[in-house]
Amino acid sequence: MKLQALIDFMETICPPALAEEWDNVGLLLGSRSARVEKVLTCLTVDRAVVDEAIATEADCVVSHHPFPYHSGKKWTTDTTEGTLLLKLAGAHIAVYSPHTAHDSALFGINRQLAEGLGLVDVKPLYEGKLKATRAMLDGLDESDALFFENDLKGDGATLGTGRIGRFEQPRTLAALVAQVKDMLQIDRALVVGSDEKRVSTVAIGCGAADEFIDEAARKGADAILMGEARFHACEEARARNVGVVLAGHYATERFSSAILAERIARKFPELSVKPSVKESDPIRIV
C-alpha cells in the first residue's frame, strides 16, 4: 500500500487540527507515494530506534515525538539529529509524528491514562478546540467507529487538551500513586502533597504538562498526573492544594506505542506493524 493511506488513517484518528500551534506534526520525512509494508512505532527517534528500523527493514517509523522536533534550515552530520535523519533517508525510511494531536485525540494518550486509572465522567481539561463530527468516522474499522460513535453521544463530543475525570470511590494520594506505579510499571514517582490527601477529581497531562496546573486547580482537581513539571510549577500546585504525581515523561507516553501499533495493524492487516523493542528511557533514578 502507499504511505498516503497510512497518513490518511493517522490524520483521521489524530486530526492535525488538534496539535498545538508550535508543534511539528505529520509526515516529516519521506514520500507520500512510497510503498509501505513494515511500520515501526516508537516514542522518540534515537540511535537505537534508527538502527532497529534499518535492521527490521521498516518502511516507516511512526514516532510520537516529532523527528526533527523543530523544522530546520539544514540537516548535516554536524548534529545527532542530522546524522540520524540522513541515515533514515539513505535507507528510504519515512517518519510520521502525531505528537500533541495524539495527546488530545479522542482515543489518545491522555484518554488512555484516564481509562487506565478507571476515571469516570472524563472530559478534556481544555475544551473547545474542535467539534467531533460524523466525518471523522470515515476510514475507521468497525471497533474504532463504534468508539467514536459512543464518544459523539456524550460529553466526549468536544475534543481538547488534557483530561479530567473523577473516581467513583475517592482514595488517598498515596493510593493514587500506587495505582499509577502499577499501571505504568514504574518503581518510583515524584509526588507533591501529603499521602493522606483525599483525591476524587484527577486531571491528566502526559509528558511535560506543568502549564495544566492552573486549569486543573480552577476546575477543582484534587490531583494531577503528569510526566514532568518544573520546580516552581510544583510550588504553585502545593500552594493551591493540588496533589501532583510526576511519573516520568517516558512512562506516561511510551506505553501508547503498542496501542497505536495494534490500531494500525487492525486497520491495515496487510502491514507488519510492531512497537520498538530497543528504545529506552534516557533518565534513570538511582
Name these PLM-found stretches.
Residues M1-V286:
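Hydrophobic structural segments
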